[in-house]
């Protein structure tokens, strides 16, 4: 059994970093999966809905806030989000096995990237560069992490409309930097991230 883990939102100047953990059944339509960066926003949403609608897909989302990013740095906050995502998936997997009278087996984990988070309760864990382009479970995780974070940033735009989060999702675009310059930092700004010419 394989669990894929990936993150979204390491680079933005605002908002949380998000991670997803996913286990896919053999019956899943793998042909719809790609690295989230290679899909349009509309297509990512379509795939997200397909994943959510499949009762045999086990998934969970984890978050680390901008405050946690500022306190422990973006790499450690990314690991924290991944650990939280896996903890959620682990509980769902236990419940899934119990409901289906299946034997519970701790999954093997593949994490996209170079670094391995401190995840317990797994059979094995390894990091694989570009796993989001080669491992279906990680592709699915990249899509869920990206869409979850995008939806969160859209919700933040309702609270802080002057920053335009619904458009740039917190990334350091010219419009975002201009909004920070004019309005000051919002409560979801990452204070530890250096912004040139601010």
UniProtKB/Swiss-Prot annotation:
Manganese or magnesium. Binds 1 divalent metal ion per monomer in the absence of substrate. May bind a second metal ion after substrate binding. Its cofactor is Mn(2+); Mg(2+). Gene3D superfamilies: Ribonuclease H-like superfamily/Ribonuclease H (3.30.420.10). PROSITE patterns: RNASE_H_2 (PS51975). The keyword Manganese applies. Signal peptide: none annotated. It is an enzyme of class 3 (hydrolase). Keywords: Cytoplasm, Endonuclease, Hydrolase, Manganese, Metal-binding, Nuclease. GO terms for molecular function: manganese ion binding; RNA binding; RNA-DNA hybrid ribonuclease activity. A divalent metal cation binds at residues 6-7, 112. One of its GO terms (biological process) is mismatch repair. Pfam families: RNase_HII. NCBIfam families: PRK00015.1-3. It is found in: Cytoplasm. Endonuclease that specifically degrades the RNA of RNA-DNA hybrids. Its EC number is 3.1.26.4. InterPro entries: RNase_HII, RNase_HII/HIII, RNase_HII/HIII_dom, RNaseH-like_sf, RNaseH_sf. This is Ribonuclease HII. The keyword Metal-binding applies.
